[in-house]
Structures are given as C-alpha cells and as structure tokens.
Amino acid sequence: MASSDGARRRANRPAPTVRYPRPVASSWHIAQVNIALLRAPLDAPELEGFVSMLAPINALADSSPGFVWRLQSEAGDATGIRAFDDDRIIVNLSVWETIEALGLFVFASRHIEVLRRRRDWFEKMADAHLALWWIPVGTIPTVEEAEHREAVIRERGVSSDAFTLREPFPAPGSNVPVPSQDRWRYPTTSRPV
C-alpha cells in the first residue's frame, strides 16, 4: 500500500519550475545611449506622431521594472539637449538595473511601436547609433561619456567597453551569462505592455 501512496503523492506534485540564472544584487547597472537623426525639425508635421509618443513612452520607461534613470530636461524629455555636434541628432540616455530589463522595455513593451515607425521619423545612420556599457550602481552617465562609448564602437567595434543588445557583454566580474537578444525580441507574450 505504501508504494501506491507514494506514487499518488508524486503524481500530484507540480512540475518543476525552470529558472533562468538571475544576477543577485549586482554592483553594476547598464547604461545605454541611443541617438537618432531627425528627418525634419521636431515641430514639423511629419514628426507629429513621434512627438505625440514621447510623453507616454517616457512615462512607460519611468515605471518599467528595472528602470533607474534617464536624461531629461525640465520639459521631461531629452529632445532639447544637444549632443554629437549636429542639431538634428536627438539623444536617449538611460540607466537600467540589467540588460534584460532594458531589452524587455525596448522589444516587449509599447516602445516597439516607436521602433516600427522609426524610418518615418529618422534618417538611416551609417555609424553606430547605440552603445551600452556597465557602470557602478549609483553612477549617472554624462552625454560626453555616451559620445565616447559610441566612438569606441565606431573605431574598434564592440567590446566590454561598449557593446550592443545584439552583442552584449556580462558585467565586470560576473559569471552570469547574458541573455540572448532573441529572448527580448520574440517574447512569449503576444501583446506589448
């Protein structure tokens, strides 16, 4: 009898949960800079769709899991901050707890709507337009540092000093593998949050 009781107990157990490695209280955050070359001035009719999405997408970022900080002026966005020696370039500079948190915001939230329409609003850039790098927790990156990290990718390619979501590097001293970009680009949820 005891063996059939044991079999019943085993049959009623839930299936084991698969757990992906997660970094524990890391001393590093991920900084990201993304630049875009505007097709027209921000007040032009052809950019109305982009401008109308700024506030809701920024609010979504601010409330997203893993979000830490973003560059913004008193207006609440960074469109008025000049960088990269071109008045048509706008800069997005932010800090996230993990690469995964950043990737999920970019590819699995309503932010994807901006990506889908980027060709309507921005010129194609020949050079690097995205750079990621690890920073100690509590550090806020500067626009000058962001320009430097993009220059690193342009001049030397991706490395642990500056990399992309497509070719990420783990945090310094970490033995936790960096999740594949495919995990963010093709999430299991069918609708952006």
Where are these predicted regions, by residue range?
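A structural signal for the main folded, soluble domain(s) of proteins
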Residues: D86-V95
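An amphipathic, aromatic/His-enriched active-site/gating alpha helix that lines ligand/cofactor pockets
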Residues: D86, I99-D127
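Short coil/turn motifs at secondary-structure junctions
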Residues: R39, E97-I99
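Short S/T/G/P-rich N-terminal loop/turn motif that feeds into the first structured element of a domain
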Residues: R8-D87, L104, A128-V193
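Generic anion/oxyanion-binding catalytic loop in active/binding sites
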Residues: A59, V91, E100
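Tryptophan-centric aromatic hotspots in well-structured domains and transmembrane helices
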Residues: W69, V95-W96, W121-F122
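Serine residues within intrinsically disordered or low-complexity segments
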Residues: S3-S4
